[in-house]
Amino acid sequence: GTKDIITAYVSKDGAVTFKGKLRKDAVNPIVKIELENNRQGYLDKNAAWFKNVLTKLQSEYNFDKFNFVGHSMGNLTFAQYMMTYGNDKSLPQLNKQVNIAGTFNGVLNMNEDVNEITVDKDGKPSRMNQPYQQLRVLKDIYKGKGIEVLNIYGDLKDGTHSDGRVSNSSSKSLKYLLGNSPKSYRESKYEGEPAQHSQLHENENVANELIDFLWKK
């Protein structure tokens, strides 16, 4: 278990402040990132803000590698971060990532209808929404870096093939973006009420799976 948790607040001008302090000998510290302006339209800005958090962690705590856990739109911000800064060796390097309810190829009733888009066995979507096309460079960025990926999504089992907000096809389309580049890629599907979009990250089984994946030797 980890006791060391701090929160990084990013103001709308991109300034980062930490609430709390990490001990120098902290094992597996957790940094929760809260963006003051967390909206879909600002992916490149959000990615830059995410980088600001990492550089501050680097200078204050000597972080040289990190694991990422994201929910919903946060996954897209992180994909944009990796697309823009993933090859920058001066930054802390990604070790493992957990994507929960990822919106890689859209959000229901925003840019796709229920059961409109499917993915094939490689995770390739039958229609690609923005910014999915641009994100296809991730395959090259993830190559040879030894990154491990756990992709968690929920199916309400109500015929929508979704968690109520995000289609399973949108979440599973991450597989096609990364191809064989990660060291490992695994999907984990949760079903029924506890798999609802907002419930997923409150779900104890999800929490346990995440802890195992990130920290079990």
For the regions a language model picked out, list residue spans one by one.
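Lipid deacylating catalytic domains
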Residues: G1-V69, L76-K217
